[in-house]
């Protein structure tokens, strides 16, 4: 980790509860990141905060630290079964990741977290909640289910967190969020925090209706995409696109990379060619069962898979370290998704590489993306003669519950030729 990624403010300089501080120090957290340095002095003082910073800058630990501190220092129904904090996320994967990140603080403080998300695990989640939780982490739909059934009451809530708030609004969760917030104590009687990599004025205005005179903090990046991310753009024909991807993978030799495409079927095509070419590759799309998703992410995080092919379900909030490369096989239709996609690399002060394809189908999305990020993406040329020959792709068998979403190989690669890139 690069030293200039951190601020000059130490966690020990903050008025943190001693159990929270001890947990952070034991984990090796000494200096705050910039977003933590700006937001924590306010949230620890009980002020509502809306924080905007790029992905991988410590937003999750900023609101978790404030949440645990608040529950430990404020009067409340300690030891009760109903939650005292509510953390809402737009996706199941992000909710699970937040819960995992909270583990170091739950272990040190004795506070309990519980998960509430759709898809599967209903009975397991219900059992944990009925045994009593201090912090409920989940997606809006499942939390509303529990509230309407009378399983969860929100009248004891002291802290509310909306993570990736703009995404929650974009996905149409405004009514759900407001329903849940109306079940909580009034804004004046709770701490409310918003965090996201992008936070539009419209979203900020809507969100602030349910906050108490919030402070807005922003870490202004040198550029929206992060100055440690090397960006590169190719203009392949549809015919060359897959061969170019395979050639670049062999030339770049990424230690760990994510390849984004806009549709499930396109992701499956990419997975098929990469698996046939001997890559250790996983497939993450919206229809993959939750248990399988978590298994794939675990394999990817632990290094058993080198490549993850995904739709934008993986672009938000997932804390996967050491992703060296991101490929935009398709340019996203939403310009903000470009920022979130390539934000999977260059995290926590490390460098990263982003390679995008402006093909015949999605090149029209490029002007809006470059306008949003306020710079042109450097263009490279490729030598058609240097492209690899495509293997016969694997195909996913439909209707087979045991069909694999990952492929493993012991293949040792030999770089076949140079692509002769010209910048």
Curated annotation (Swiss-Prot):
Instruction: Please give the catalytic activity noted in the UniProt record.
Output: ATP + H2O = ADP + phosphate + H(+)
Q: Which terms under GO biological process does the entry name? A: RNA catabolic process
Q: Which UniProt keywords apply?
A: ATP-binding, Cytoplasm, Helicase, Hydrolase, Nucleotide-binding, RNA-binding
Q: Which InterPro entries match?
A: DEAD/DEAH_box_helicase_dom, DEAD_box_RNA_helicase, Helicase_ATP-bd, Helicase_C-like, P-loop_NTPase, RNA-helicase_DEAD-box_CS, RNA_helicase_ATP-dep_RhlB, RNA_helicase_DEAD_Q_motif
Enzyme Commission code: 3.6.4.13
Residue ranges annotated as motif DEAD box: 163-166
Q: What are the recorded GO MF terms, alphabetically?
A: ATP binding; ATP hydrolysis activity; RNA binding; RNA helicase activity
Q: Where does ATP bind?
A: 53-60
Query: Origin, by domain of life?
Result: Bacteria
Q: Where is this region: Disordered?
A: 397-423
| Motif window: Q motif | 9-37
Q: Name the Gene3D superfamilies for this protein.
A: P-loop containing nucleotide triphosphate hydrolases
What subcellular locations does the record give? Cytoplasm
Major localization class = cytoplasm
Q: Which GO terms describe its cellular component?
A: cytosol
List the biased-composition ranges (Low complexity): 400-410
Provide an example Pfam family for this protein: DEAD
Listed Basic residues bias regions: 413-423
- Output the SUPFAM superfamilies linked to this UniProt entry: P-loop containing nucleoside triphosphate hydrolases
Where do the Helicase ATP-binding domain residues begin and end? 40-217
Give the UniProt family note.
Answer: Belongs to the DEAD box helicase family. RhlB subfamily.
Self-association state and partner proteins as the record states:
Component of the RNA degradosome, which is a multiprotein complex involved in RNA processing and mRNA degradation.
Q: What does this protein do?
A: DEAD-box RNA helicase involved in RNA degradation. Has RNA-dependent ATPase activity and unwinds double-stranded RNA.
Instruction: Name it.
Output: ATP-dependent RNA helicase RhlB
Give the source species: Pasteurella multocida (strain Pm70)
Kindly list the organism's lineage.
Answer: Bacteria, Pseudomonadati, Pseudomonadota, Gammaproteobacteria, Pasteurellales
């Amino acid at each position: 980790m690069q030293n200039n990624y951190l601020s000059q403010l130490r966690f020990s300089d903050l008025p943190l509860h001693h159990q929270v501080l001890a947990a952070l120090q034991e984990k090796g957290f000494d200096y705050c990141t910039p977003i933590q340095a700006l937001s924590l002095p306010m949230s620890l003082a009980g002020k509502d905060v809306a924080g905007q910073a790029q992905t991988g800058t410590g937003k999750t630990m900023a609101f978790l630290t404030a949440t645990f501190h608040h529950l430990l220092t404020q009067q409340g129904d300690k030891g009760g079964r109903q939650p005292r904090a509510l953390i809402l996320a737009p996706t199941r994967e992000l909710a699970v990741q937040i819960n995992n990140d909270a583990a170091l603080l739950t272990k040190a403080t004795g506070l309990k977290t519980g998960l509430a998300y759709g898809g599967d695990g209903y009975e397991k989640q219900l059992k944990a909640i009925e045994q009593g939780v201090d912090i409920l982490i989940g997606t809006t739909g499942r939390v509303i289910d529990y509230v309407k059934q009378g399983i969860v009451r929100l009248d004891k809530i002291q802290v509310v967190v909306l993570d990736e708030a703009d995404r929650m609004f974009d996905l149409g969760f405004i009514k759900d969020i407001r329903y849940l917030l109306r079940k909580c104590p009034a804004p004046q009687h709770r701490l409310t925090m918003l965090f996201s990599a992008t936070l539009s004025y419209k979203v900020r205005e809507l969100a602030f209706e349910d906050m108490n005179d919030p402070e807005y903090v922003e870490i202004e990046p040198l550029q929206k995409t992060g100055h440690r991310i090397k960006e590169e753009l190719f203009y392949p024909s549809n015919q060359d696109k897959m061969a170019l991807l395979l050639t670049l993978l062999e030339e770049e030799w990424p230690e760990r990379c994510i390849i984004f495409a806009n549709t499930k079927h396109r992701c499956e095509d990419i997975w098929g060619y990469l698996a046939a070419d001997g890559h250790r590759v996983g497939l993450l799309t919206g229809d993959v069962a939750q248990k399988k998703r978590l298994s794939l992410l675990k394999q990817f995080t632990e290094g058993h898979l080198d490549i993850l092919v995904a739709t934008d379900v993986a672009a938000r909030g997932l804390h996967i370290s050491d992703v060296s490369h991101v490929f935009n096989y398709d340019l996203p239709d939403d310009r903000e998704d470009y920022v979130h996609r390539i934000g999977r690399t260059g995290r926590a002060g490390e460098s990263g590489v982003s390679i995008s394809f402006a093909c015949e189908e999605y090149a029209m999305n490029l002007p809006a993306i470059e306008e949003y990020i306020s710079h042109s993406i450097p263009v490279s040329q490729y030598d058609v003669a240097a492209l690899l020959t495509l293997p016969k792709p694997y195909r996913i068998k439909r209707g087979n519950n045991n069909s694999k979403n990952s492929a493993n190989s012991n293949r040792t690669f030999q770089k076949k030729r140079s692509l002769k890139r010209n910048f």
